[in-house]
Amino acid sequence: MYPAHLLVLLAVCVSLLGAASIPARPLNLYQFGNMIQCANHGRRPTWHYMDYGCYCGKGGSGTPVDELDRCCQIHDDCYGEAEKLPACNYMMSGPYYNTYSYECNEGELTCKDNNDECKAFICNCDRTAAICFARTPYNDANWNIDTKTRC
């Protein structure tokens, strides 16, 4: 084998090893973001909900700081229940990686009937949270808080 071929092979191997260490990005977060935009008619960017209070975003603990944060706590709990379903126990079928079918029609969200049990459950978790976000006031003071002292 030529030295150039070995270098190419080495580069490919290193790239694959690097890619294997990158955590998979949840697939349904994009759908959940679209549901939020549908329910609130695009009034607030989705990223505003990613670091709000004690529960909106990754993880969650303590007492929710307000009603919007409570929406996120309920959503987290709903995903926890989804993970317990036998239909959601397969690799890449849980709430963070499973995509579902839904419709948005003038702010009305509908989970479609063609979803299997796991997808239907996850879709309803996201739908309920998106509707909760849309009807609940947003307090700028609760965005990007110090969760170690406030939660």
From Swiss-Prot:
UniProt signal peptide: 1-27
Pfam families for the chain: Phospholip_A2_1
Tissues expressing the protein: Expressed by the venom gland.
Disulphide bond pairs: C38-C104, C54-C151, C56-C72, C71-C132, C78-C125, C88-C118, C111-C123
Residues where Ca(2+) binds: Y55, G57, G59, D76
Note on how the cofactor is bound: Binds 1 Ca(2+) ion.
Keywords: Calcium, Disulfide bond, Hydrolase, Lipid degradation, Lipid metabolism, Metal-binding, Secreted, Signal, Toxin
Family indicated by similarity: Belongs to the phospholipase A2 family. Group I subfamily. D49 sub-subfamily.
Role of this protein: PLA2 catalyzes the calcium-dependent hydrolysis of the 2-acyl groups in 3-sn-phosphoglycerides.
Name of the molecule in the record: Acidic phospholipase A2 6
Organism: Tropidechis carinatus (Australian rough-scaled snake)
